[in-house]
Swiss-Prot record:
The keyword rRNA processing does not apply. Residues 139-165 are annotated as: Glucose-binding. Transmembrane segments: none annotated. Its EC number is 2.7.1.1. Residues 198-436 are annotated as: Hexokinase large subdomain. The lineage of its organism: Eukaryota, Metazoa, Ecdysozoa, Arthropoda, Hexapoda. Residues 65-197 are annotated as: Hexokinase small subdomain. This is Hexokinase type 1. One of its GO terms (cellular component) is mitochondrion. Gene3D superfamilies: 3.30.420.40, 3.40.367.20.
Length: 465
């Protein structure tokens, strides 16, 4: 018979530590209200630069209805790979996609900025020829996972790459124009780059085509971010025409807490993670809720408890002592066993050369993992409920992309529970998984932008306003 344990009685030192990770409803309400104030500042012309939730304009001001038709290209630019997609909208709720992943050689990624985009343009040209659409006029949208300063739908100034890219020559330049210039070297194809969006906006648009009430995109992976649909009248930093009433906003809420808004719930383990990170003092909200940080936080707690003799007292600590060694995949494996079973937890500890563990210690490990991920879900719920209440819509769908939501056995349940507790009960919502959908969203954006640009001509994309 499998053993079950009472944390308070069976591993009291662990229980005492985990109590530090249990925010109250009042705490979560306080976080929600602080988030709302920071969003209001982020949208403000006068206070934008002082906000930890800067609310960048996406310049996407149309939402799909599901009745649009046509074929388009998308380019997904991610830290580890790029993907080119041909997306066809042929009938209601029916999307056909054909794609090809391209791995950029390190010499190209580390070279001049123009080399990166020449490589991408060459890959796009080869792709459309392979798909026998090289004679077609193809609008293209870019889904971009790197930091941009957006100045228009089709103007995105590159602020920084991640560590996988070293092409410093592209920093400070317009990504869209760099790709347009590279594609101009292939006059035999007709590809029109219409704009650039981030991953969250892409996920939002992709789900919105199938579920037109979609108004939030939530990224729950190694990075933590969200986007939502705001009324243009609230977007004081927008200086364009206001005849379109909506704007997708990239919250960039990872930095929420950078000026102390979350200090009241931070504990010594949170502070250690922050101090030892590559960016101490910044991206505080992400350090509560990002997948990488959850695994690292568990590792810090376990190592501290091992040193005190509370758990795994006689086991080696050299492997688990390595920073970032316990990743989200391992964390999910630890909690995936049914109650009273610790097979997966032992398999994970085997990787750290911690073998033949006592069930009590493995139960404590699972309890720590559950505690850390539950708190992360609660804090994300504070942010999501803030967005829901700001929009004041009777029903919305929320596009969620990220392995922690999709694969963790309880994260989605906790997130749903606390979002319902925190949001105004008059507003209904539904979380919907949208795995790897940002390219489809970029294609939709390209289609809508093309339709708006060529309103007087024959449209490739049939819009329904």
């Amino acid at each position: 018979m499998a053993n079950t344990f009472n944390p308070e009685e069976d591993f009291p030192e662990v229980y005492k530590v985990c109590k530090l990770f249990n925010p109250s409803i009042d705490d979560l309400e306080k976080i929600k209200n602080a988030m709302d104030r920071e969003i209001t500042m982020g949208l403000s012309r006068d206070h934008h630069d002082r906000s930890t939730v800067p609310c960048h304009l996406s310049y996407v001001q149309d939402l799909p209805t599901g009745r649009e038709r046509g074929q388009f290209l998308a380019l997904e630019m991610m830290p580890t790979n790029c993907r080119i997609m041909l997306v066809k909208f042929s009938s209601e709720r029916d999307i056909y996609t054909s794609s090809k992943c391209v791995i950029m050689p390190h010499t190209v990624a580390a070279g001049r900025g123009t080399e990166v985009f020449t490589f991408l343009a060459t890959s796009i040209a080869n792709f459309v020829k392979e798909k026998k659409v090289d004679k077609d006029n193809l609008p293209l949208g870019i889904a971009f996972a790197f930091t941009l300063k957006k100045l228009a739908l089709d103007v995105g100034i590159l602020v920084s790459w991640t560590k996988e890219f070293g092409a410093q020559g592209a920093i400070g330049k317009d990504v869209v124009q760099l790709l347009r210039d590279a594609l101009a070297k292939f006059p035999e194809i007709s590809v029109d780059v219409m704009g650039i969006i981030n991953v969250g906006a892409g996920s939002l648009l992709a789900l919105c085509w199938a579920q037109p009430d979609t108004r939030i995109g939530l990224i729950m992976g190694s990075i933590a971010n969200s986007c939502y649909v705001e009324r243009v009248e609230r977007c004081e930093t927008y200086e364009g025409d206001e005849y379109r009433k909506l704007m997708i906003i990239n919250s960039d809420w990872a930095h929420f807490g950078d000026t102390g808004q979350l200090d009241f719930i931070r504990n010594e383990y949170d502070r250690q993670l922050d101090t030892e990170s590559i960016n101490p003092g910044t991206r505080i909200y992400e350090k509560f809720s990002g997948a990488l940080c959850m695994g690292e936080l568990v590792r810090i707690i376990v190592l501290r408890l091992m040193k005190s003799g509370a758990i795994f007292a006689e086991d080696r600590r050299d492997y688990i002592g390595i920073q970032w060694k316990l990743d989200m995949v391992s964390l999910i494996e630890i909690v995936s066993d049914p109650p009273g079973v610790y097979t997966k937890a032992q398999e994970v500890m085997d990787k750290f050369r911690i073998r033949h563990c006592k069930e009590r210690d493995l139960a404590a490990l699972k309890y720590i993992c559950d505690t850390v991920t539950n708190r992360a879900a609660m804090l994300v719920a504070s942010g999501v409920s803030c967005l829901i209440d700001r929009m004041r819509l009777p029903q919305i769908s929320i596009a969620v992309d990220g392995g922690i939501y999709r694969l963790h056995p309880t994260f989605s349940t906790v997130l749903n529970k606390y979002t319902r507790l925190l949001a105004d009960p008059n507003y209904n919502f539904e979380f919907v998984i949208t795995q790897d959908s940002c390219g489809v969203g970029a294609a939709i954006m390209a289609g809508m932008a093309h339709a708006n640009k060529y309103k007087t001509d024959a449209k490739l994309f049939t819009m329904d306003y």
